[in-house]
């Protein structure tokens, strides 16, 4: 009897659903922990390392906050939202720093089930919320970016807007004071956690205002909600924002009758003018330029040189195939289609769900702006599927028993989640660095000073700074074409030019931090170099760096190290492209060859490689189409780690070299085909 009473209590049922969905989400994320724990190479300092490259930026910031200081101009994320939260968790919990950054995403990202279930409960549809929570918490895209070890702001980047959506819907349905104060609170937290959410928050508030004007134009509380929410978008300090919001909230709560529409209109107009004057639209324009129009700021900042656009090389901002788009959002194409149908049906039944459109549309921008956006559509589409399933159950109950209906719903849910389970099983992401790489960089920390620089590609910038506690020229946040030019040049040109460029780029970068805002050092370091060395032709200046008699006039202020991991060969053609571009035209018109490959087949005395090249089994020549090309030399590498290799000359007039990696330490790269220019590069020679 007592059991039946508990089941009749809607709050206990709701709580049970939240707990079950949360535990389900966490357990699914523990699969990667279980799998990765089998590999010693994924461990450092007695804990699994993280799998997010950008995560090391926040880890560095948290580490510096724990230490209480960081070096000037070291690009540390000291004081950033995720670093701050990590710092406090480290201070108040008994867990190690490595364990905290490993598991934070596991537990925080799973909180997405709470607003999903609460939102569905506002429509008196708990089943809709429960099914949606199960699907959304582990759908391909959301899982990929919030799995264990994925230490990044993505762990709350969907949780927070779903809470905002929940309070907007609750405000529409209940018109309560709790929603009125909670709405700006969560918008403020979201903006602090993820400043790039500004555009989405503006869209949500704007749509809420339009909804108010259409359906609730005579209700004051909705206008006050818009004003309070808009105040969080201002650039003033958070404590001033909070004070103004609390005062206005208190005035409305205590003096509703005296706050007539004229006063509310004046407050709204003043808020709008303040936002415009404080540059409120600038963040929106930046996001549109970077992700939609693929603009590179370096082209705008520099009036002379046209650098390589980094957006052409980032997978996250590449256009995504439509089938992949559907799978990433809902686990499978069929579930996506049912979810879309369910969401349209949900909109017809409950018009307040129109507030979810900005989140859904942002996710659909993945078709143009890149696959990283798909996570936004995940919870909204999951709600559509949950609604469809709840309607399906209502139909079943009319024809069959409750037990039969429940069995059908459970079976359908499991069937829906099966592709997601398969994805989780197959998605075995490696850690960013191996144990050997992390240990090597950790050793460098004991050799180098904090003011020293490591010149490497931007992919490795954050983790290098974290493990070695040094400075870098580029990283995952500083990698415009004008930034990447210098490490690209140092890695892909000859050793003499590499040494000179490494020294110049580091010293000029340090000088740029203290230069006036309108100084050429702030806009283009390369032009500043040319000015100081009395050079007007960029090609002649860069060529002069290869000459032994080139004299560096800039005083040496620190040591410089080069980090050139073997696996960088997989992306080295991209790395080189940044400095082989024609700086006057922006066109890559200086051809070079550097191509990694693995064998696909061997027949008739020929080796068919994955890059389309057909190599003779004696390695003396290769074919591209019908053209037979001679090989200059064969370089057999027995051990990259030990530096054991053998060079066999073949034709000294030929322009191409074949590297044969016997130990195959680099995945998918047993052969490397390169021309003489790449063979003489610092990356290959060193």
Q: Residue locations for each model-derived region?
A:
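Start-transfer (signal-anchor) and selected internal transmembrane alpha helices
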Residues: 1-44, 116, 129-130, 245-273, ...
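Short hydrophobic/aromatic helix or loop-helix immediately within or flanking a transmembrane segment
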Residues: 54-67, 72-96, 107, 154, ...
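Extracytoplasmic
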Residues: 62, 66, 404-478, 549, ...
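Hydrophobic, aromatic-rich transmembrane alpha-helices
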Residues: 209, 247-259, 324-350, 686
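Hydrophobic/aromatic-rich transmembrane helices and adjacent perimembrane loops
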Residues: 338, 354-397
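Luminal/periplasmic acceptor-recognition loop/helix of membrane-associated glycosyltransferases
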Residues: 471-569, 586-634, 640
């Amino acid at each position: 009897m007592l059991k039946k009473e508990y089941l009749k209590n809607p709050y206990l049922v709701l709580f049970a659903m939240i707990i079950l969905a949360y535990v389900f989400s966490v357990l699914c994320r523990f699969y990667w922990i279980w799998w990765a724990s089998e590999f010693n190479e994924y461990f450092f300092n007695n804990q699994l390392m993280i799998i997010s490259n950008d995560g090391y930026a926040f880890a560095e910031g948290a580490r510096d906050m724990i230490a209480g200081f960081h070096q000037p101009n070291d690009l540390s994320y000291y004081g950033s939202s995720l670093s701050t939260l990590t710092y406090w968790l480290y201070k108040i919990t008994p867990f190690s720093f490595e364990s905290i950054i490993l598991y934070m995403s596991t537990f925080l990202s799973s909180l997405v089930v709470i607003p999903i279930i609460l939102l569905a409960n506002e429509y008196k549809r708990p089943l809709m919320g429960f099914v949606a929570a199960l699907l959304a918490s582990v759908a391909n895209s959301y899982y990929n970016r919030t799995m264990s070890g994925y230490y990044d702001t993505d762990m709350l980047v969907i949780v927070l807007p779903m809470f905002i959506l929940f309070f907007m819907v609750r405000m529409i349905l209940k018109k309560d004071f709790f929603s009125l104060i909670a709405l700006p609170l969560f918008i403020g937290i979201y903006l602090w956690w993820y400043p790039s959410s500004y555009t989405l928050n503006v869209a949500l508030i704007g749509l809420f205002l339009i909804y108010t004007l259409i359906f609730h134009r005579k209700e004051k509380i909705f206008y006050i909600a818009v004003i309070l929410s808009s105040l969080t978008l201002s650039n003033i300090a958070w404590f001033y924002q909070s004070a103004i919001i609390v005062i206005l909230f208190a005035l409305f709560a205590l003096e509703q009758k005296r706050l007539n529409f004229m006063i509310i209109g004046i407050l709204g107009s003043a808020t709008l003018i303040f936002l415009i004057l404080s540059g409120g639209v600038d963040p929106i324009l930046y996001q549109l330029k970077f992700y939609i129009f693929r603009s590179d700021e370096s082209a705008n900042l520099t009036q002379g040189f046209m650098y390589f656009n980094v957006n052409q090389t980032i997978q996250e901002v590449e256009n995504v195939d439509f089938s992949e788009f559907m799978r990433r959002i809902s686990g499978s194409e069929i579930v996506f289609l049912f979810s879309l149908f369910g969401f349209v049906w949900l909109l017809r039944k409950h018009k307040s769900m129109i507030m979810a459109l900005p989140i859904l549309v942002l996710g659909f921008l993945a078709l143009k702006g890149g696959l990283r956006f798909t996570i936004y559509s995940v919870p909204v589409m999951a709600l559509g599927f949950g609604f469809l399933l709840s309607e399906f159950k209502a139909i079943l109950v009319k024809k069959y028993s409750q037990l039969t209906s429940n069995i059908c719903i459970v079976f359908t849910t499991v069937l829906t989640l099966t592709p997601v389970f398969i994805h989780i099983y197959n998605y075995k992401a490696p850690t960013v660095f191996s144990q050997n790489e992390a240990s090597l960089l950790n050793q460098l920390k004991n050799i180098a000073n904090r003011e020293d620089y490591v010149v490497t590609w931007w992919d490795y910038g954050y983790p290098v700074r974290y493990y070695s506690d040094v400075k870098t020229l580029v990283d995952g946040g500083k990698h415009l074409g004008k930034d990447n030019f210098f490490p690209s040049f140092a890695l892909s040109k000859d050793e003499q030019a590499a040494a000179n460029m490494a020294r110049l780029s580091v010293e000029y970068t340090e000088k740029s931090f203290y230069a006036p805002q309108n100084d050429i050092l702030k806009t283009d370091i390369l032009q500043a170099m040319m000015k100081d060395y009395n050079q007007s032709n960029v090609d002649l200046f860069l060529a002069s760096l290869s000459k032994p008699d080139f004299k560096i006039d800039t005083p040496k202020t620190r040591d410089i190290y080069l980090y050139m991991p073997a696996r960088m060969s997989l992306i080295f053609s991209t790395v080189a492209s940044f400095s082989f571009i024609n700086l006057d035209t922006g066109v890559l018109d200086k051809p070079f060859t550097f191509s990694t490959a693995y064998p696909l087949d061997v027949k008739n005395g020929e080796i068919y490689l994955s890059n389309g090249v057909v190599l003779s089994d004696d390695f003396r020549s290769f074919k591209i189409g019908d053209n037979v090309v001679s090989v200059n030399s064969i370089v057999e590498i027995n051990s990259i780690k030990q530096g054991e290799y053998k060079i066999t000359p073949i034709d000294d007039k030929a322009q191409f070299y074949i590297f044969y990696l016997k130990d195959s330490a680099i995945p998918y790269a047993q052969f490397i085909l390169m021309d003489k220019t790449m063979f003489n590069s610092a990356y290959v020679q060193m």
